[in-house]
């Protein structure tokens, strides 16, 4: 009876995490739609202002302002800088490539984090997980199809997204593990506005009302998704949370088809199955070994989450 009750207790967090990741994908689709007319930096700038709305409401509701005191601003600066770059390269990739292909690239992040944890955090990753990493990289290559006729040079720009996202996570993991979630989401958004605003000064283009509304909605989606995913990560077992992240691939296929008429190729299907299998294997191995490298990552926030 207790086991059944325990499983039921995870259902709200499970569905909220799925909703959060679907909001992330919806945000990506909106960005892809409006990026035809505006610079990516301007989209990030406007998006981040609106993302502050749910973030501020969340912080106010939980009385998190006092937890901003004593924050390590150096950690926040470099973490936010690398994450701003990751978002820039992600949005650029979503605009220039099919959504499912870009998600194949985004989901290289956990694999790169695992490699980075060995190089920079002195984590021990044995041959089984390294084998999974190799399979994941092979899956990404299959999905991207670098030897096909439709390969685009922008793929190499998009590949900078998982590299920067992994760097952001590793910075936090090494130097900022004691920082509060509130300091990450508040300082992260403020610094994102500053970084993107520097470029917007020189390239701002007046948005029409409909595009401004869409960009604002994408920002609210993003801020809300961060909160949902972070809270789910704090309460769900790592194996469950680490598996949910892959719903983004399915949501990306769905929205890519419905909104943009993108039809996944056989390479996309095969490659993403391999990527998901490799990622899930790493998650399961970490749970068995009681490690916490990949299972604590949350897309975009990229924060090692502390359990309650």
Locations of regions flagged by a protein language model:
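Membrane-interface interhelical linkers
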Residues: 1-22, 52-78, 127, 177-182, ...
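Glycine-/small-residue-enriched transmembrane alpha-helix faces in small-molecule transporters
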Residues: 1-42, 149-174, 294-308
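Juxtamembrane helix-entry segments on the extracytoplasmic side of multipass membrane proteins
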Residues: 9-13, 68-72, 140, 145-167, ...
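Hydrophobic/small/kink-forming positions within alpha-helical transmembrane segments
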Residues: 21-26, 56, 80, 84-88, ...
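Helix-loop interface residues and adjacent transmembrane-helix termini in multi-pass membrane transporters
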Residues: 37, 93-96, 122-124, 178, ...
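C-terminal transmembrane-helix exit sites in multi-pass transporters
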Residues: 92, 109-131, 250-269
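Helix-helix packing/entry segments at the starts of transmembrane helices
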Residues: 102-108, 175-191, 226-257
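Hydrophobic transmembrane alpha-helices of multi-pass small-molecule transport proteins
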Residues: 128-145, 267-286
């Amino acid at each position: 009876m207790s086991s059944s009750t325990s499983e039921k207790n995870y259902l709200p967090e499970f569905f909220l995490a799925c909703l959060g990741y679907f909001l992330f994908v919806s945000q990506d689709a909106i960005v892809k739609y409006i990026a035809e007319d505006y610079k990516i930096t301007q989209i990030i700038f406007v998006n981040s202002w609106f993302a502050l709305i749910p973030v501020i409401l969340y912080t106010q509701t939980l009385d998190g302002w006092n937890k901003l005191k004593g924050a390590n601003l150096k950690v926040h600066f470099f973490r936010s800088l690398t994450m701003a770059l990751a978002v820039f390269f992600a949005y650029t990739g979503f605009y220039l490539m099919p959504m499912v292909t870009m998600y194949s690239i985004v989901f290289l992040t956990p694999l790169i984090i695992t490699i980075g944890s060995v190089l920079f955090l002195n984590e021990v990753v044995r041959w089984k997980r390294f084998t999974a990493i190799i399979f994941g990289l092979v899956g990404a290559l299959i999905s991207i199809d670098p030897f096909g006729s439709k390969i685009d040079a922008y793929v190499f720009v998009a590949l900078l997204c998982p590299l920067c996202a992994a760097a952001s996570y590793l910075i936090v993991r090494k130097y900022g593990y004691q920082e509060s979630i509130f300091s990450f989401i508040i300082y992260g958004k403020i610094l994102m506005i500053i970084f993107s605003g520097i470029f917007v000064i020189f390239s701002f283009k007046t948005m029409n009302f409909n595009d401004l509304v869409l960009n604002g909605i994408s920002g609210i989606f993003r801020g809300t998704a961060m909160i949902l995913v972070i809270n789910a990560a704090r309460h769900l077992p790592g194996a469950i949370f680490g598996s949910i992240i892959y719903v983004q691939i399915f949501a990306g296929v769905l929205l890519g088809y419905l909104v943009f008429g993108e039809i996944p190729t056989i390479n996309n299907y095969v490659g993403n199955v391999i990527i998901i299998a490799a990622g899930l294997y790493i998650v399961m191995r970490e749970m068995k070994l009681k490690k916490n490298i990949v299972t604590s990552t949350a897309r975009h926030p990229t924060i090692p989450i502390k359990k309650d």
